[in-house]
Amino acid sequence: METSASATASEKQEAKSGILEAAGFPDPGKKASPLVVAAAAAAAVAAQGVPQHLLPPFHAPLPIDMRHQEGRYHYEPHSVHGVHGPPALSGSPVISDISLIRLSPHPAGPGESPFNAPHPYVNPHMEHYLRSVHSSPTLSMISAARGLSPADVAQEHLKERGLFGLPAPGTTPSDYYHQMTLVAGHPAPYGDLLMQSGGAASAPHLHDYLNPVDVSRFSSPRVTPRLSRKRALSISPLSDASLDLQRMIRTSPNSLVAYINNSRSSSAASGSYGHLSAGALSPAFTFPHPINPVAYQQILSQQRGLGSAFGHTPPLIQPSPTFLAQQPMALTSINATPTQLSSSSNCLSDTNQNKQSSESAVSSTVNPVAIHKRSKVKTEPEGLRPASPLALTQGQVSGHGSCGCALPLSQEQLADLKEDLDRDDCKQEAEVVIYETNCHWEDCTKEYDTQEQLVHHINNEHIHGEKKEFVCRWQACTREQKPFKAQYMLVVHMRRHTGEKPHKCTFEGCSKAYSRLENLKTHLRSHTGEKPYVCEHEGCNKAFSNASDRAKHQNRTHSNEKPYICKIPGCTKRYTDPSSLRKHVKTVHGPDAHVTKKQRNDVHLRTPLLKENGDSEAGTEPGGPESTEASSTSQAVEDCLHVRAIKTESSGLCQSSPGAQSSCSSEPSPLGSAPNNDSGVEMPGTGPGSLGDLTALDDTPPGADTSALAAPSAGGLQLRKHMTTMHRFEQLKKEKLKSLKDSCSWAGPTPHTRNTKLPPLPGSGSILENFSGSGGGGPAGLLPNPRLSELSASEVTMLSQLQERRDSSTSTVSSAYTVSRRSSGISPYFSSRRSSEASPLGAGRPHNASSADSYDPISTDASRRSSEASQCSGGSGLLNLTPAQQYSLRAKYAAATGGPPPTPLPGLERMSLRTRLALLDAPERTLPAGCPRPLGPRRGSDGPTYGHGHAGAAPAFPHEAPGGGARRASDPVRRPDALSLPRVQRFHSTHNVNPGPLPPCADRRGLRLQSHPSTDGGLARGAYSPRPPSISENVAMEAVAAGVDGAGPEADLGLPEDDLVLPDDVVQYIKAHASGALDEGTGQVYPTESTGFSDNPRLPSPGLHGQRRMVAADSNVGPSAPMLGGCQLGFGAPSSLNKNNMPVQWNEVSSGTVDALASQVKPPPFPQGNLAVVQQKPAFGQYPGYSPQGLQASPGGLDSTQPHLQPRSGAPSQGIPRVNYMQQLRQPVAGSQCPGMTTTMSPHACYGQVHPQLSPSTISGALNQFPQSCSNMPAKPGHLGHPQQTEVAPDPTTMGNRHRELGVPDSALAGVPPPHPVQSYPQQSHHLAASMSQEGYHQVPSLLPARQPGFMEPQTGPMGVATAGFGLVQPRPPLEPSPTGRHRGVRAVQQQLAYARATGHAMAAMPSSQETAEAVPKGAMGNMGSVPPQPPPQDAGGAPDHSMLYYYGQIHMYEQDGGLENLGSCQVMRSQPPQPQACQDSIQPQPLPSPGVNQVSSTVDSQLLEAPQIDFDAIMDDGDHSSLFSGALSPSLLHSLSQNSSRLTTPRNSLTLPSIPAGISNMAVGDMSSMLTSLAEESKFLNMMT
């Protein structure tokens, strides 16, 4: 890379002329590059039939693939055979001629790729040169036409020219090479032709040997992978005993080729392998005999050229005058690159030193077009070089590219060059080349003739003169006279002002000099190939010549940390390494804006909101880092459109576009050259401005990422990466910084809101902070950033691997690779951030995610990005994972891998699964209400659209709900935004699941969302599951989050909709039941609920979703006594039914309860409907139960709910209450609906007991009174309406609590003002216990009001209605048969969870209660917000609503006015008590128990068990459903299951939990869609995660 710098143009010319003369070529002007010589030699050899063994170094051209990008070149020696050259072309053919001429007599086979055919005698060098030809249009075209490989073309060309002066079969390779060198003297027609035709693409490869001039100016598809990040070792590999490397290096003016090629850069994209650059000699290129130094130099220079072809800086060889005259344009381009390099190097010198001379390279780096900077030559100042191409070429070449003139280069190239230079030379010493001869010390105006004199003067008179004071008093010194600790430090510092560089490279031909000895030592490694710094990451063997490169690599590749933050006010850039930060400061803020070490180390998080997204743009070096994806890779999440990309690119935060000369330029981030990512993760195909570029920028800047990560708010900057051009990024940076702060809209400008980049925010807590900072309360403001921040802060922090910076090798690898590679240590979500995100979107879910998002399959970043795109539909969130979600992912991973459990999040343990779910769902909730995701068609398996019966508009899934934030692809927790129906729908796999039309959802969303905009943010982000979830818990949490966030049942199950792994019988059962039971029974009830939701458009907000769901349950329970009878059966009976319908799971969940219920469970006339409801409750109860204490602990208001939940979740422990509840429910189920109601009341009473925390007596009474309450329900509708509203209002607190508790209420609460939640809760409670008496109901409200968040939580907490109405309100899933006997109950619960989540609208369609229910189940807050009401209100929607309802057994039935009635069946109830019969009908469908329905008892007990222990067997064994169920259930459910080993013991069939939407179980599992079987399944899940 420093090659040009090392040799002066004159030296090069002399060397070349000497070579040419020696070769007998008098025409120095037309020097052929060594590559040409090699090619000629090869051709000659072939023509002469040189034995194959003679030219072992010649290898067939390597196909261009990942290996090349990663620099992994495998040279397989092969025999060389004679080649028959075609008739020579006379003169310099034109492209047209070339295209018509067949260079090779051997036609390519019909199926053969003319480019991939290995050529027997293409030497490694030629391979390198020719390799790019493959990608070069010109050569490719020509060679393709002739059926030639690029090597063939070169050889043919050489042959044509009669360059067959190779030795006979006895000659040695060294002789051969020497001859080739001689041959190089001949002009190369093709080279000329290529150059003339502008076939730069191929030229870069052939130019060296075909032409005297480097063709780097020709842009090749692969030419700008970006200068290799790895310093290509010019020839260190060729340390043959007979080869005098030292001599070669010193005598070769091109010895710095490696530097020019950026061999130092570690980017795999550069195509360098370790030190070897693609252009470097192949390891196979051995010289048995001493090689002519000149020839070797020629070869090296060729390599250098190659390097440029591969994105390396072309050797700064001065083209012959002839060539210049012929190719002025080419020179301009080529020269630009060298200039760039030199200027980059200069500017990149030492940031510390760059401050002083603004005219130095820094400027040049900043301004690639025409930057005049002094020559790098330290001996004397060199006048500014002319900008003219010729001047540039000559001056630049002569000055080794030190010339400051930068010819116009593509911004990518500039960025690459800059970055490379920076890394190499400048990185070592980013000091601006200064040649000061005048003293500017204070009060000193002495002037000297030479720098030496000045230095002497300063040292003697100023430094040593002021013996005890080591202060720099140089005018305008950035240190501001801050004293140094030692004199030597001041002496070294003064070199920054004087430009003295006493440490000169001792290698011949290298003129590098450094002011710091350490920099020289590092530089010398480029000559020696020494790489003492080995990556410390286990399993990574990469070595680096300097610690900075290693640190950069480790930070980018193995972590998301960006500790180096730009301290310039208003700049939020963050970088992985100090050199990138220095480069950024110097290039973006100017050489004077020096960042001191202290400043660099002062990594306080920046306030910029963008950073909050987790990956600050700063994280993406200049430009790239700046544009670091906002908070989440999911672009969709970020903007609802862009949030999906894991690395959300917050264009707004891009202070300097990667392509822009500013920071982006300074850090030749991949933005300029998408293929070139500092982290190397970016896919080579990515173009500048593309997501990949942005991502690459994020990753590329070595320090950029770090910085970005360091500052959560910098995340927004990531969008900037998206900007196609550097300038655009600049603008975005400035504009977005403001816009990002304002809202998620920042993601809009850059669809890939990269802010979601995974860089860990300073703290996991920062996620919430970010959320709040983003606009915490508001879906719009909070959405993109909140989730991003959430993900970035906690997920990134917790799942640093998640953010794993793209690897240099990520270029071409698919996200799957990246996932496995990167997320191997993290949860599957992270593993396939992108893919998972895409899958969560599901085929049916339309999203902004573009395939580009997954551009970097290998890198998390890439995944991040693609997932971001995929998650466009999803909410906006880094990973859309709250710290709790991240924790759960980590816990899962740890459990699967047997590693130590992750450190529990603070408060995670005390949070109930619901809360965790809420947390998980929060990101979705954070989706701007205004950005409802388009509802994609449900997957075929999902059955009718959620709202098949509703307005025909597909209801948005909870994750699609405005509140839903995008989540990273690897963000399983967060299913696609509520906007996407398919996920949620999949839960039922029956139309029930399908939410109502999205528009209705949007409407409701609009209504409610407004009130609970912050619901998503608050709940999802506010609540963390206090206790660290076990793997199952994590799975459940993820599933819940996924389910909550997930769009459909599938999401609820934690499985991709179509990926939902359910036994065929279960699927059929679900479908039959869903269509039949839901349609018939639950269908009626649910439709009622749906209607209720529809009736309550205001339920639209995410909070509404949660409310709706719960309301629906509530409605079922309380709308009318009869209806409530059925509803209660749906809710109350659901408890039993849940146990029955999802016998294994539910029964296992509450063994004690199961016993009583078990017998009844088996006979579930309407248990399915009820069971579904109960299941929901169980699921949530389990969730809460899972961490019911957690719920209790986390939400104050939830306490009552938690107890409530506990009785239910903890039923095993609170077996009696649960049993009672179950029994009561069951009795109602078995008995009349009313009795069921009454019975349900008992369960509700149990819940009430829990509620008692809320308002034990009241709730208890209310619950017990609920049947009466049925009547009351109608009366309470208004009240409910208020509660709903209230529920929405409490959003922030409620959300947090709710999230903690269940996550569902949060949604409902978050979106709804706290008063509503309170009211809603009371309503729900009322619904649940209509009898609960308005008093009790009111009490609940009062209770809730006191702790509205808690209230919501209580709503959510209890599977049934929140607090008072938890039990009764519990949506009854019975209508929707669970896939298996799990019963639609479980499935319903899952569905409800997923549905509530996914179809917040369904909930919305349902009465507010339903809405609440939805919110409750899935962090419906987010979903609700996102898809507030897409209620399938009337149609099957009713059932879907119910699904939502029973999804949240706990969902509060905060029905807005008449919410009880409105609530799903509640509506029916309200409209007609008969609805209960509908409930019964829905229950009746239960007869079609899902497989293993009767097995329920142990499984159910297990689930119900509060124990955190997770039954992986049960969960995973549940297989498709189990894990889904666990997902649907809270981690507590999972724990309960595990506690009840019965679940483990219970046949996997018995574990009917599969009915729970995949989204509900951990998304990872869902996404992995293979890990739903057991602990082994869990392991499988982990494996899939990885």
Swiss-Prot record:
Biological role: Functions as a transcription regulator in the hedgehog (Hh) pathway. Functions as a transcriptional activator. May also function as transcriptional repressor. Requires STK36 for full transcriptional activator activity. Required for normal embryonic development.
Alphabetical list of InterPro entries matching this protein: GLI-like, Znf-C2H2_ZIC1-5/GLI1-3-like, Znf_C2H2_sf, Znf_C2H2_type
Pfam families in the record: zf-C2H2, zf-C2H2_15
Source superkingdom: Eukaryota
One GO CC term, this protein: nucleolus
One MF annotation (Gene Ontology) recorded for this entry: RNA polymerase II cis-regulatory region sequence-specific DNA binding
Protein location: Nucleus; Cytoplasm; Cell projection, Cilium
Bias-annotated ranges (Polar residues): 1-10, 342-367, 791-802, 1469-1485
Disulfide bonds: none
Chain positions with N6-acetyllysine modification: 757
Protein name listed in UniProt: Zinc finger protein GLI2
Involvement in disorder: Holoprosencephaly 9: A structural anomaly of the brain, in which the developing forebrain fails to correctly separate into right and left hemispheres. Holoprosencephaly is genetically heterogeneous and associated with several distinct facies and phenotypic variability. Holoprosencephaly type 9 is characterized by defective anterior pituitary formation and pan-hypopituitarism, with or without overt forebrain cleavage abnormalities, and holoprosencephaly-like midfacial hypoplasia.
PROSITE patterns given in the database record: ZINC_FINGER_C2H2_1, ZINC_FINGER_C2H2_2
Zinc finger map (C2H2-type): 437-464, 475-497, 503-527, 533-558, 564-589
Compositionally biased intervals (Basic and acidic residues): 589-605, 968-977
Region (Disordered): 1-22, 342-389, 577-636, 650-716, 742-879, 925-1030, 1182-1215, 1421-1441, 1469-1498
Residue positions where Phosphothreonine is found in the record: 725
Expression tissues: Expressed in breast cancers (at protein level). Isoform 1 and isoform 4 are expressed in HTLV-1-infected T-cell lines (at protein level). Isoform 1 and isoform 2 are strongly expressed in HTLV-1-infected T-cell lines. Isoform 3 and isoform 4 are weakly expressed in HTLV-1-infected T-cell lines.
GO BP, one annotated term: odontogenesis of dentin-containing tooth
Domain description: The N-terminal domain confers transcriptional repressor activity, while the C-terminal domain mediates transcriptional activation.
Gene3D superfamilies noted in UniProt: Classic Zinc Finger
Native source organism of the sequence: Homo sapiens
Subunit architecture: Interaction with ZIC1 and ZIC2. Interacts with STK36. Interacts with SUFU; this inhibits transcriptional activation mediated by GLI2. Interacts (via C-terminal internal region) with FOXC1 (via N-terminus); this interaction is direct and increases GLI2 DNA-binding and transcriptional activity through a smoothened (SMO)-independent Hedgehog (Hh) signaling pathway.
